[in-house]
Amino acid sequence: MLFRSIRVEGQPLRKVGGKGYLIDTGGSGFELGRDALIMAFRATDGRCEHTALVELIEAQMGVPVDRWMEKIYDPVTGGRPFIASFAHNVFKARAMGDWAAQEIFDRGAHLLGDLTHAAAKWFDGEFSVAMNGGLVINFPEYAEAIRKAAHPRAKMIPSGAPPVYGAAVEALWDIGMEPGPAFREHFLNAYAQMQKNP
């Protein structure tokens, strides 16, 4: 759930957040996974208290900490998706009462909530925000924390569509077209078929 477009009827689209994967990753799976790795490395170096993230990440890595770097930077299997795959450990460790996981969780929810505070200036009253993405779908506690961090006038609603649907809708808006219910139905059916037969 990284903001992309603010749509106010009769006005041009405005952008908040969504500045790309090199700059604007606040609260994303990549950022949570990266921060989990950072805290695990810090703990094993003795730069902070121990965190359960060390054991959880070591179990997922399948190798001891001194071999993590080669997996993270592997040109074939490492990189951003690999790093994002560690995000779920934040939620596991947080459920165990881990201090580092709680900090990562809180910071991510706050960064996503901030987007709604920036968007609020464009609306006179309540405004809807579609919540989407693997983290808010699979971890309802994260969605709830984002809701709490959001602007009081932001109506946070589950999207019910894959994130790519929002990109398609935005593309139509960019060319002055209005996506209606038929577009949504056709898009979601085509997407479902594509998922069955990649």
Q: Which residues does each PLM region occupy?
A:
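Short, small-residue-biased leader/transition segments that mark boundaries at the very start
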Residues: 1-2
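A short alpha->loop->secondary-structure connector
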Residues: 10-18, 22
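Hydrophobic, well-ordered secondary-structure segments
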Residues: 13, 29-37, 50-54
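A short glycine-threonine-serine/GTX helix/turn-capping micro-motif
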Residues: 20-28, 74-78
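Short, charged, low-complexity patches
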Residues: 25-34, 160-164
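ATP-binding/phosphotransfer module of carbohydrate and carboxylate kinases, centering on a glycine-rich
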Residues: 38-198
